[in-house]
């Protein structure tokens, strides 16, 4: 599905203004350009963050306007688009624009959503719930496969570890890989402190370099990275997003590590 290239799902957490979204997409494309022989970039952003901690938090522009902006990103930069969906109706609408439909971690066991998304024939990225073991992901996978759609990505984004904390178990990469689909590591949501700031989630971005390197060394097929020009003023997940400057600095490291691991795997075959 993605050949041997490293999958890089990258973009802002939520769609803000059209101009901001296009600016971020343009900068990511510029950063990724030297690595297109080795990296498969997919732009991601959400039209609705339906599970914000507070009723007063910004959720996004909504389905119709959000898809219009994502369509403009797709047309302007020629990049594949990923967004998350929350209902069968949203899945069918989003598939008209997006190449990859993401099942949010909190909804990863919702049968009707999984089946409806899969029936659009889009690629389905299932994020492993913070409450599930990696072995439990076979259930959501089977629900997608029941439709005849085998275009699946599995994303590890950490497990609940007491109150307001997550931990990343790198054994999960190996377990999920045995299911036969590309496994992506979410390097930004994995450092969240869910609800840790009362009205919104906190984060420990200083651990993103360590965890992303560990995931690639463990055999992950790619990374999911939310990034922004200035995370401090971002309208969602400000505490866990990576600045574009840091994203640019880490990309060559990720690329080299991915290529190194793949070369060892090929030599072992």
Curated annotation (Swiss-Prot):
Its EC number is 2.5.1.55. It is found in: Cytoplasm. Pathway: Carbohydrate biosynthesis; 3-deoxy-D-manno-octulosonate biosynthesis; 3-deoxy-D-manno-octulosonate from D-ribulose 5-phosphate: step 2/3; Bacterial outer membrane biogenesis; lipopolysaccharide biosynthesis. Keywords: Cytoplasm, Lipopolysaccharide biosynthesis, Transferase. The keyword ATP-binding does not apply. One of its GO terms (biological process) is keto-3-deoxy-D-manno-octulosonic acid biosynthetic process. The keyword Cytoplasm applies. One of its GO terms (molecular function) is 3-deoxy-8-phosphooctulonate synthase activity. Its main location: cytoplasm. It holds the Pfam family DAHP_synth_1. It catalyses: D-arabinose 5-phosphate + phosphoenolpyruvate + H2O = 3-deoxy-alpha-D-manno-2-octulosonate-8-phosphate + phosphate. It is an enzyme of class 2 (transferase). One of its GO terms (cellular component) is cytoplasm. Gene3D superfamilies: Aldolase class I (3.20.20.70). It comes from the Bacteria. PANTHER family: PHOSPHO-2-DEHYDRO-3-DEOXYHEPTONATE ALDOLASE (PTHR21057). Belongs to the KdsA family. This is 2-dehydro-3-deoxyphosphooctonate aldolase.
């Amino acid at each position: 599905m993605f050949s041997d290239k490293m999958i890089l799902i990258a973009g802002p957490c939520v769609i803000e203004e059209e101009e901001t979204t296009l600016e971020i997409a343009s900068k990511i494309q510029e950063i990724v350009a030297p690595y297109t022989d080795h990296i498969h970039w997919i732009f991601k952003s959400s039209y609705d963050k339906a599970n914000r901690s507070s009723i007063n938090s910004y959720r996004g522009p909504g389905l119709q306007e959000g898809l219009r902006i994502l369509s403009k990103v797709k047309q302007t930069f020629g990049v594949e688009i990923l967004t998350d969906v929350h209902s069968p109706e949203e899945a069918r609408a989003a598939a008209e624009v997006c190449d990859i439909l993401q099942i949010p971690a909190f909804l990863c066991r919702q049968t009707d959503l999984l089946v409806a998304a899969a029936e659009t024939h889009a690629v389905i990225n299932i994020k492993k719930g913070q409450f599930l073991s990696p072995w439990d992901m076979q259930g959501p996978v089977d629900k997608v496969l029941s439709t005849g759609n085998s275009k699946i990505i599995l994303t590890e984004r950490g497990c609940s570890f007491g109150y307001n904390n997550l931990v990343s178990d790198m054994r999960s990469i190996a377990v999920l890989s045995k299911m036969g689909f590309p496994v992506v590591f979410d390097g930004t949501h994995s450092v969240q402190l869910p609800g840790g700031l009362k009205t919104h989630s906190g984060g420990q971005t200083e651990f993103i370099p360590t965890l992303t390197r560990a995931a690639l060394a463990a055999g992950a097929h790619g990374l999911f990275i939310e990034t922004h020009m200035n995370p401090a003023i971002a309208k969602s997940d400000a505490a866990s997003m990576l600045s574009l400057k840091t994203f640019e600095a880490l990309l060559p490291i990720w690329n080299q590590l991915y290529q190194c691991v793949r070369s060892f795997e090929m030599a072992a075959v």
